Amino acid sequence: MAQKVNPISVRLNLNRSSDSSWFSDYYYGKLLYQDLNFRDYFGSIRPPTGNTFGFRLGRCIIHHFPKRTFIHVFFLDRLSQSRHQGLGAIPSVKLIRRINDNTVKQRNEVGIWPKKRYEYHDRLPSIQKIDQLLRVSDWMADIHSTFQSIWPKDENDDRRASEERYAFSRFAPSILVAVRAEKKKAIFGSEGDFFGFTGRAFLDYFVMQYFFNLKNQIQFDPMVNRSPVAQGVAKTSMIGKAIPAKTEQGTQSGESICQPRSTLYFDAIIFLRYARFRKATSLSSRYYYLKKMQSLFSNQTKTNTLIQPVKIASVYQSASLIAQEISWKLEQKKSFRQICRSIFKQIKKCPYVKGIRIGCSGRLNGAEIAKTECKKYGETSLHVFSDQIDYAKTQASTPYGILGVKVWVSYFLTQKKGTSCAISKTYKIS
C-alpha cells in the first residue's frame, strides 16, 4: 500500500515537515484558500516553455502567524543550470547547506530557530528585521571579489560579511553603480534569473493594483512613485505636452506650461505601456519588485506578508525540479529513455542521492496506445518509512496529448563530511 499513496504524506512528522503551517482552527478554510492562491501564483510565473528556461520552483514553504505570513521560495539558480545542456550541466558550486537542529552555526546562518515546548519558536519573528529572516550561506561566493573591490577588507565587520550572503540586500547607490559597471553581466546573467520574469510579472502587479484602486475609487497616480520606472515615465510623458508660455500672461521667457493629466485611466495606460517593455536586470529593481509583490499579498490578505527567496544550485536537490526538467525535455520532443539515461549518468556524481525512480504515462513517442514506462536507479524503497523520499508530479503537453510524469527521489539520511546536502532536509523549519 505504500506505493499507492503519496510518500510525503506518510512521512510527515517522521523525517519530513509540512509545507504549510498555521496556528488557527477557526480560519482553517481561509488560510488553506490563501495557500492555494499563493502556490498557483508562484507556479504561473513564467513557466518553462519552448527554449525559455523559465522560473523553476522547487518548493514553497508558508508559515501563517497572527497578522503575519512568511513565504520561503526555493527556486533553481539560472546561472548554475545551463539552458542548452539542461540536465547534463551539473555545476561545481557550493550547494545550500542542510538546515537542522544539530548545528547551532547553521541555525544562526539561516535565521531559523528550533521548536520549543509549546510548538512555536522561542523568539518572535517580528523582532527580526526583514532582511535577516532567512540568510543563505555562501550563495554570493561567486561575486565575493566584486564586493571586495568596493569595500575594504575588514575581518571584524560581521554586518558587512552578512550583507554579502543575503539574497536581497540594501546596497548603497554607489555600490550598485560599481557592481553594474564591473560585473553586471557575469553576476546576474541575461535572462532566466529569479527576477528575470520582471518584465511581465511587474506589469501584472500594476494591472491588479490599478483595478483594485479603481474599484475602491481611490486616487491612483502611477507617476507618484519612487520607482525608477515611474520616474522615467514622468519625464517622458511630458514630451509633446509643453506649450510655449505667452509674454502677455507675465511668464518669463524660456518657461513652459504643461497640460495637467489627472485622468486616472490615461495615466495608468501610459505607465503600463512603458512597464510592458521594461526588463529589470539590476539588483535594486529586483529588490523593488520583491517589495511590491509583498505589498500586493499584504493588501489582499490583510496581513504582513514577507517573501524570502532561496537559490538551489542543483536540479537534483528537489524532485519537483527534476519533474519540471523532464517535462520540459518531453515538450521539446526528446526521447524518454534518452532523458533517463542522462539523469542516471549525472546521479552518480551526486553523493547525497540514494536512488531515483521516474514514471511516465501517455502516448510516448507518438504511440497509438497509451502506455506507462518506469525507470529507476539505485534504491527507492517506498515501504521503509524511515527513508527520506521526495515526490513530485507534473504534466507535459505534446502534439500527441498530455504526458504524466512522476518522480521519486531517495536521499541519504546521513551526509559525509565535505559533501553537499539535498534541500529535502532544509525544510525542517516549522
Curated annotation (Swiss-Prot):
Q: Which processes are annotated in GO (biological process)? A: translation
Highest taxon in the source lineage: Eukaryota
Q: Which InterPro entries match?
A: KH_sf_prok-type, Ribosomal_S3_C_sf, Ribosomal_uS3_C, Ribosomal_uS3_CS, Ribosomal_uS3m_plant
Give the keywords, sorted. Answer: Mitochondrion, Ribonucleoprotein, Ribosomal protein
Q: Which GO terms describe its molecular function?
A: RNA binding; structural constituent of ribosome
Q: Which SUPFAM superfamilies match?
A: Prokaryotic type KH domain (KH-domain type II), Ribosomal protein S3 C-terminal domain
Subcellular location, principal: mitochondrion
**Pfam families per the record?**
Ribosomal_S3_C
What is the annotated localization of this protein? Answer: Mitochondrion
Q: Does the keyword Ribosomal protein apply?
A: yes
Q: Which family does it belong to?
A: Belongs to the universal ribosomal protein uS3 family.
Its recorded name reads Small ribosomal subunit protein uS3m
Organism from which the protein derives:
Marchantia polymorpha (Common liverwort)
